[in-house]
Amino acid sequence: MDQQPGPVQQSSPPNLTNPRFTLELEFVSSLANPYYLSHLAVTYPNLLGISKSGDEGETSNESSDPEAKAFAAYLAYLYSYWKTPEYAQFLTHPGATLRALRLLQEETFRRDIIRPQVIEALAGTGVDEQGAQDTQEGEGEQKQNKEEDAQDAQENTESKT
């Protein structure tokens, strides 16, 4: 009865000898690279809710694709605990990694990362995501607030070391 409700199922503390922990650490660390995000979008468009037919009008693709829903839930699960200082301390690039995980929570971003302009904007901006905001309509302020949250998590991690 000590179980807490919610998506976080990672109850044990982070341990580098735990295969699941190291696998997830490697995966979330890879997300810091915008070109890896591009690779995911091109190679596995179904996971990100991207239409293979190229129809721009299809916006409900994710809701009809169980793989996209499952992957979105997995990304939410990863973000829920990697943003905590206990786990973020293991990230080599916490700002970029948490930014990518946060952005991947948004269906529009998952759908738009197949566009080269979005990837180039992410690659050219580092921690500041102004370029990525230009590619998203009306979500700039929300993204900026979330970026500040990621920076706070990074500062918390740095203060513990």
Curated annotation (Swiss-Prot):
Q: Which Pfam families match?
A: Med31
Location of the protein in the cell: Nucleus
Q: Which GO molecular function annotations are given, in alphabetical order? A: transcription coregulator activity
* Gene Ontology terms describing biological process: regulation of DNA-templated transcription
Keywords, alphabetical: Activator, Nucleus, Transcription, Transcription regulation
Main location per the UniProt record: nucleus
Question: Which InterPro entries does the entry link to?
Answer: Med31_sf, Mediator_Med31
* GO CC terms: mediator complex
Report residue spans for region: Disordered: 124-161
- Range of residues in the leader sequence: none
Subunit and interaction comment: Component of the Mediator complex.
Q: Which family does it belong to?
A: Belongs to the Mediator complex subunit 31 family.
Its biological purpose is as follows:
Component of the Mediator complex, a coactivator involved in the regulated transcription of nearly all RNA polymerase II-dependent genes. Mediator functions as a bridge to convey information from gene-specific regulatory proteins to the basal RNA polymerase II transcription machinery. Mediator is recruited to promoters by direct interactions with regulatory proteins and serves as a scaffold for the assembly of a functional preinitiation complex with RNA polymerase II and the general transcription factors.
Q: What is this protein called?
A: Mediator of RNA polymerase II transcription subunit 31
